[in-house]
Amino acid sequence: MAKPPVRKPKKKVCAFCKDKTQYVDYKDTNMLRKFISDRGKIRARRVTGNCTQHQRDVATAVKNSREMALLPYTSTAR
């Protein structure tokens, strides 16, 4: 018996490229929380759908935001 064809997952579109955003702001914590897991880790590019450059910008912004104490380094749940 032949296996049914496997569907390819839909390619995610970079949210920053779609909105034509030039700068990822480290002070915008509501936006940055979308790119952080519930454990406080930065989500992977294949999960978020960001392009390479914007994923780097998000990682830098999250790290700056953590340094400025706007975002936690880890989650509070234990």
Curated annotation (Swiss-Prot):
GO CC terms on record? cytosolic small ribosomal subunit
Name a single GO biological process.
Answer: translation
Q: Which domain of life is it from?
A: Bacteria
Q: Name one Pfam family in it.
A: Ribosomal_S18
Q: Which SUPFAM superfamilies match?
A: Ribosomal protein S18
Q: Which UniProt keywords apply?
A: Ribonucleoprotein, Ribosomal protein, RNA-binding, rRNA-binding
Q: Do you know which InterPro entries this protein is assigned to?
A: Ribosomal_bS18, Ribosomal_bS18_CS, Ribosomal_bS18_sf
Name one molecular function that GO assigns to this entry: small ribosomal subunit rRNA binding
Primary role: Binds as a heterodimer with protein bS6 to the central domain of the 16S rRNA, where it helps stabilize the platform of the 30S subunit.
Q: How does it assemble?
A: Part of the 30S ribosomal subunit. Forms a tight heterodimer with protein bS6.
Q: Please state which protein family the record places this protein in.
A: Belongs to the bacterial ribosomal protein bS18 family.
Query: NCBIfam families recorded for this chain?
Result: S18 (TIGR00165)
Name of the protein: Small ribosomal subunit protein bS18B
Give the organism, scientific name. Streptomyces griseus subsp. griseus (strain JCM 4626 / CBS 651.72 / NBRC 13350 / KCC S-0626 / ISP 5235)
User: In the UniProt record, what gene is named as encoding this protein?
Assistant: rpsR2
